[in-house]
Amino acid sequence: MSKTSNSNWETTVKPIVVLSVISLVDSLLLALVNSMTAPVIAENTKRTTLAAYVGVLPSVSDATELEEVTGYTTANVTGVVKAPDGSLAIKAEESGFDGGIVTVIVGMDANGTETGIWVDASTQTKGIGSAVAEDDFLKQFDGLDCTQNVVMGENGVDGKTGATFSSKALFAAINDCVNCYNELA
């Protein structure tokens, strides 16, 4: 009888206990690593965002010149800053291919003309969806009137061939920025 009981322990219960302990230890280690790296990741994200804001606003040379804007209600807009000359940089995020986020920052002067655009499509398929962030593709938006929504295939702006979901996400995020600009204007 004890042999059957011992056999049941060895074949059924022991593996479950061992795997549970291993899973618990792994979870604790992952939580520890996450708590140590989360502040570093947040700081790097903030630094990247501030650099992108400065990059899309030609009148600004340093992020300390920017003033954070609040009070907007436009969906998917995650940040707005204002330069001393009244130009704005607006950040929006939309879902691209496979749910990956496409982040867009559009700079607009006080008249609503696009002054720069920055795109992070690193979550999109490399070489296909990520191509919506390439400078050659983004040049088509130079000087665009950002007081009206941008329609893919109209006014000289086209989507990226082979990157339908990423292109739609890019245009949706740009239009989120346009809508926010109009809300704040």
Where are these regions (language model features)?
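Flexible, solvent-exposed loop/hinge segments and secondary-structure transition points
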Residues: 2-185
